[in-house]
Every structure is written in structure tokens, then in C-alpha cells.
């Protein structure tokens, strides 16, 4: 099955009074009416299953007046810069969309943060789709200074496919020295009805994170929408991940991953590069400047 997009090219025009009104109206709505969200967790998948770190569940109290003042100042500054640039229709649309999605990300994450640890990433492209958007939630069922039993779920949109996962895990904390845990999860591809089961283990220290996952398919052959007269199913496999930094130089970090999958034609590198029992090694080096302190 082929996929294609059709659209119309919009004429470009100089910044008009109408565009200015639309921009200011959007900003006013965001300031005066914070986003109200209701959410029913639909927990279910991700190709990667690195569990979110244990974050503080403490509440941060901020007065409504301070939030409004900060929002007004921020929006006014951004709007002033935007209006002075004499933007066209595309710039106006991008500005409005960016401001709206940023506010939505903030409001949803703060609301979900009342119940657990949440990570929200909403993206809206020029077609107003949710491509590369994701929502992850970790909820502690039993939480003490030394042990935590939790459930975690996620849903995300990648490559025109919607995938989800749900899982349970247990972590043991040895003071401030290290953490070890195990987890089990179910991945489900909502777009193609593929399912797999996974188990994992993790070990963390202040400067090092180690994890390993195994994947077992739970669904059979199905017709592939990408290749004519072809069937597909999840591949069994496993991966090992390491992430850390130098204690003496914390701004310099690195990550390393090895993954292995089994099958005659596994598309680890894409549907057009299928291989037998493929494996891959990926590495990344990051540098985070140390923020300056203020007196």
C-alpha cells in the first residue's frame, strides 16, 4: 500500500492586520485560560524500554499570581520580537503553533505530575498532525526510601505509526549509592496490531546507568502494508545499554548500545535493508556546559 500526501500551496503575503490580531488573540487565550486536560491512561509501546529515572515526588508550590505575571512577560517579549520582524503567513502560523504546543506540553505535564512522573512531547507540523509526539507516565504503586513498585505506560507517534506500551517494575535503592531493578512490559503497535512481550533489568549509580532487555513476539504473521505480497511479524531479540559520565568531569557524557535480533529478513535498518539475524552498535557523546551561578 502506498502513502502519499496532497496539498495546496498557500500564497505568501506581507504581515497584515488580520494576522496580527490572530497572533495576539492566541496569546491572550493562553494567558487567560490555561489548558484544562482530562486524561484516561491508555497504556501500551516503545522499541526502547529505558525506564524513567526515579524523580522527586515533592510538590513545588507556586502562586497563581506569579505564574500569570511570568506568562504575560514571556508572551509579551516573544510577541514583541515576532511582530517587529514583519512575518509572512508561514511565520505567523509557525509562531502561533509553537506557542500553543509549548503551553500544552507544560500544562499536561504539570497536571500529570500530580499523580506520578510524566514526560510529554507534543509536536504539530505544518499539516497539524502529531508526528513524533509522545506521552510517558510512571506511577508508583508502593514507594518507600528503599523499594518502589511501579507501573509505567507510554504512547507515541513515529513514522506514521502509533505504538504503546505498559509495564510493571520493581526497584531497590541502597541509600544514595546505587539502584537495581527488574521490569516486564508489553509492546503493542496500534497501527498494525503487532504485539511483543519484554523483560528487563537495570543497575544505576550516580554516574553510570546499565540496562538489558529481552523481547519475545506475541503475535503472528500479518500482511505488510509496506511491501506487496509480503507478511511481517515482530522479531525476537535483546539489547544492552550503558550511559554515564566521568565523575571528575560531569559535563562530558557518553552512551553505548548493542542490539541483536533474530530472523531471516529482519528490517532493523529499514524495510528496504532486511538482513538475517542483524545486530547494531550505536554510540553517542554529549557535552553539557556547567551553568553559571549567580551571586
From Swiss-Prot:
- According to the record, the signal peptide region is 1-25
Write out the coiled-coil annotation as residue ranges.
none
UniProt entry keywords in alphabetical sequence:
Signal
Q: Which GO terms describe its biological process?
A: cell adhesion
Entry GO terms, CC: cell outer membrane
Q: Which Gene3D superfamilies match?
A: Inverse autotransporter, beta-domain
Spell out the InterPro entries in the cross-references. IAT_beta, IAT_beta_sf, Intimin-Invasin_domain, Intimin/invasin_bac
Query: From which domain of life does this come?
Result: Bacteria
The UniProt entry's sequence similarity note says: Belongs to the intimin/invasin family.
Query: Sorted alphabetically, which PANTHER family does this protein's record hold?
Result: ATTACHING AND EFFACING PROTEIN HOMOLOG-RELATED (PTHR39576:SF2), ATTACHING AND EFFACING PROTEIN HOMOLOG-RELATED-RELATED (PTHR39576)
Q: In its UniProt entry, what is this protein called?
A: Putative attaching and effacing protein homolog
Q: Which organism is it from?
A: Escherichia coli (strain K12)
